[in-house]
Amino acid sequence: MNCEREQLRGNQEAAAAPDTMAQPYASAQFAPPQNGIPAEYTAPHPHPAPEYTGQTTVPDHTLNLYPPTQTHSEQSADTSAQTVSGTATQTDDAAPTDGQPQTQPSENTESKSQPKRLHVSNIPFRFRDPDLRQMFGQFGKILDVEIIFNERGSKGFGFVTFENSADADRAREKLHGTVVEGRKIEVNNATARVMTNKKTVNPYTNGWKLNPVVGAVYSPDFYAGTVLLCQANQEGSSMYSGPSSLVYTSAMPGFPYPAATAAAAYRGAHLRGRGRTVYNTFRAAAPPPPIPAYGGVVYQDGFYGADIYGGYAAYRYAQPTPATAAAYSDSYGRVYAADPYHHTLAPAPTYGVGAMNAFAPLTDAKTRSHADDVGLVLSSLQASIYRGGYNRFAPY
């Protein structure tokens, strides 16, 4: 019996040995960190630490598990705050969107209530405004109907203006492409045409009446820049008595002075109706004195300086007194003197380059020599005037 008791004691002591082996595990105060978060950053537990050292694993687990639950609660609180703020902002944003549908219908109603114009093309040519009004009047109130016409009749298109744009759109959808009297009409929205103001171009040269093209016809001497040979007095004229002489004047191109009208009147004497602009009434008065300083002819009326042209001899034989001539002259310089058939005036038969070289008799020998010296220049000038003034309607 004693032996059995000793064995039992030995077994009990041997069984008590593991109690001593459990002490090293009690020194561990913290469990390994979870979710990769170091242990020193974890929030301290608000409860005091337990006084007993046994069974420390349970408070250790509670100590380690509590901070994640606290962070989760904080995150959930943050997310809840975010969701609340998000819903608040969404509601704030949704407020104007709720108000937009209220303004859009008003804008649509305003746009639909405005008048609208339609362009109707390819309509029958016999259509008139009442026909077009009857065709479109079934869709709504029409303010205006207009069909475009020219001198030959309808141009086949027009415009219809509706009081309400919705009626205009409905009429356009219904009538576009329909066939009326064999013609497929087209109805479209009329667009406003942009009207641009064209800049007016001054057609005059140097500020006076003749442009370069017309000036080359009516005053070739001004554009050629040649030398004019003019007789200073009318040989044998009772209206003017003075020394017989020739005056040399240079025609300046583009000379904007009364010389332009003087040259036009100068040629108007032999052309009978061309170029005579202002000085028609000078036939009834004495000619003005010579003005050799100006680039043109000496006399402002071509009648008194026309001996330079031989073609004027056809008119001189029937020329009456100056007062009678003024009474029978019209605004174009035509003289209805003795011949009753002068209303069908044609160019004189002797009018030509060769006949134009025939001068009136000059008494002064010095004047004759001067005329011989410049004969070539005068011939070229007469030829240019003849081609430019007389044959201005010829094709070549």
Swiss-Prot record:
Region (Disordered): 1-119
Keywords for this protein: Cytoplasm, Methylation, mRNA processing, mRNA splicing, Nucleus, RNA-binding
Tissue: Detected in brain (at protein level). Detected in heart, brain, neurons, skeletal muscle and embryo.
Asymmetric dimethylarginine, modified sites: R316
GO molecular function annotation: mRNA 3'-UTR binding; RNA binding
Pfam family for this entry, one: Fox-1_C
Chief location bin: nucleus
CDD domains in the record: RRM_FOX1_like
Positions where Omega-N-methylarginine occurs in the chain: R387
InterPro entries (alphabetical): Fox-1_C_dom, FOX1_RRM, Nucleotide-bd_a/b_plait_sf, RBD_domain_sf, RBFOX1-3, RBFOX1-like, RRM_dom
Domain RRM: 116-192
Any one Gene Ontology cellular component term annotated for this protein: nucleus
Location relative to the cell: Nucleus; Cytoplasm
Extent of Low complexity compositional bias: 87-98
Residue stretches of biased makeup (Polar residues): 67-86, 99-112
Keyword match Cytoplasm: yes
Gene Ontology BP annotations: mRNA processing; nervous system development; neuromuscular process controlling balance; regulation of alternative mRNA splicing, via spliceosome; regulation of skeletal muscle cell differentiation; RNA splicing
Ribosomal protein among keywords: no
Site (Interaction with RNA): R117, F125, R126, N150, K155, F159, R183, R193
UniProt function note: RNA-binding protein that regulates alternative splicing events by binding to 5'-UGCAUGU-3' elements. Prevents binding of U2AF2 to the 3'-splice site. Regulates alternative splicing of tissue-specific exons and of differentially spliced exons during erythropoiesis.
Assembly with partners or alone: Binds to the C-terminus of ATXN2.
The protein's name in its UniProt record: RNA binding protein fox-1 homolog 1
Species in which this protein is naturally found: Mus musculus (Mouse)
Lineage of origin: Eukaryota, Metazoa, Chordata, Craniata, Vertebrata
